[in-house]
């Protein structure tokens, strides 16, 4: 496993890490026992960074991480997120009192005294522009309750704005082969400013695994069913903003990336790990098999310059126009 510095922080994070949205719920049926085994397998392979949020299973994914990382607090870094347990448009959600309460609850569930990275969870742009939430986070950092803070953003514009805040240590962005806009300006600027990039939705909610056909039916409690057209939250969080049927067709046109790399999942993750400025990529998982498959991405061959250019042109000519939502 290769480790990258998360921006200017002193955190060295595994280039392949994991997100825990799926094991908290919202991705259909999950098993705690299987999730704990999967977390153990990831850590055994050298994964030292996990991303979670207070709303993933109403805190359940944080509780699972507490169990899995007991006794390993100094070596396993955890990033959590806040604001979506409240009204994201209400400034009171971002007050010192509210944010401190969210943090204390997360720390209690995680059974930790300090959080390595605390991220604002896709707030509206007006909240970021207001700026007071950054002052609150500065205070929590001074108090030693968090080591660093960052922002999970929905758009490149929001990301560029956050890069002007001197104490923002990381940005979490939707980024995959079917959603490449951050490469143009956001990643180079983040690198220049010394801000780490955490790539989320790397498989476009499973589209880039190649396992779906257009008639696939998701469970009703899976966001790929209830948010497929952005009914519940930003459409970009589900299938990277692509209509499902179109996404399946586009993914199939990328089937060639699996040659010499085992499968499309590993290829899609490797492609992200190859992009300059990306600190870590955080695919989700539900079981040991998925973790093991994702871990193989570290070992597969790099993309050649010709292949990278082919993927860039494909995105520009075939994909970009079909992406919906704020981007």
Task: State what each model feature region is.
Residues 107-126:
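Active-site groove signature of glycoside hydrolases
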Residues 1-76:
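N-terminal binding-site loop/beta-alpha segment at the start of enzyme catalytic domains
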Residues 123-316, 327:
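Beta/alpha (TIM)-barrel catalytic core signal, keyed to glycine-rich beta->alpha loops juxtaposed to Asp/Glu
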Residues 30-42, 94-110, 154-161:
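Short, acidic/polar
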Residues 24-25, 54-56, 84-86, 122-126, ...:
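Short histidine/acidic/glycine/proline-rich micro-motifs that form metal-
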Residues 11-16, 46-49, 72-76, 112-116, ...:
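Short, well-ordered coil/turn segments that N-cap beta-strands
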Residues 75-87:
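A short, structured active-site edge motif that brings together acidic residues
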Residues 21-33, 85-100, 125-126:
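Active-site mouth loops of central-metabolism enzymes
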């Amino acid at each position: 496993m290769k480790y990258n510095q998360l921006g200017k922080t002193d955190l060295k994070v595994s280039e392949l890490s994991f997100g825990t949205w799926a094991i908290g719920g919202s991705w259909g049926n999950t098993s705690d026992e299987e999730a704990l085994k999967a977390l153990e397998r990831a850590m055994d392979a050298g994964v030292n960074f996990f991303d979670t949020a207070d709303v993933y299973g109403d805190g359940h994914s944080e509780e699972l991480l507490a169990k899995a990382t007991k006794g390993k607090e100094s070596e396993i870094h955890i990033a959590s997120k806040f604001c979506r347990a409240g009204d994201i448009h209400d400034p009171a959600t971002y007050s010192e009192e509210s944010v401190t309460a969210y943090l204390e609850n997360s720390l209690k569930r995680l059974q930790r005294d300090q959080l390595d990275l605390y991220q604002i969870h896709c707030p509206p742009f007006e909240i970021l522009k207001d700026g007071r939430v950054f002052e609150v986070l500065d205070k929590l950092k001074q108090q030693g309750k968090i080591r660093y803070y960052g922002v999970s953003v929905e758009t490149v514009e929001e990301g560029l704005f956050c890069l002007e805040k001197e104490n923002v240590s990381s940005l979490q962005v939707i980024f995959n082969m079917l959603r490449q806009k951050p490469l143009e300006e956001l990643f180079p600027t983040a690198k220049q400013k010394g801000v780490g990039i955490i790539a989320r939705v790397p498989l476009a909610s499973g589209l880039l695994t190649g396992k779906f056909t257009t008639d696939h039916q998701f469970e009703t409690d899976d966001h790929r069913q209830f948010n497929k057209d952005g009914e519940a939250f930003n459409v970009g969080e589900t299938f990277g903003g692509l209509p499902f049927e179109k996404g399946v067709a586009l993914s199939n046109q990328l089937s060639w990336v699996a040659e010499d790399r085992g499968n499309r999942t590993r290829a899609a993750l490797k492609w992200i790990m190859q992009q300059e400025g990306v600190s870590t990529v955080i695919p989700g998982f539900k079981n040991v098999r998925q973790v093991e498959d994702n871990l193989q991405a570290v070992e597969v061959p790099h993309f050649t310059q010709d292949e990278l250019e082919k993927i860039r042109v494909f995105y520009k000519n075939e994909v970009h126009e079909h992406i919906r939502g704020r981007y």
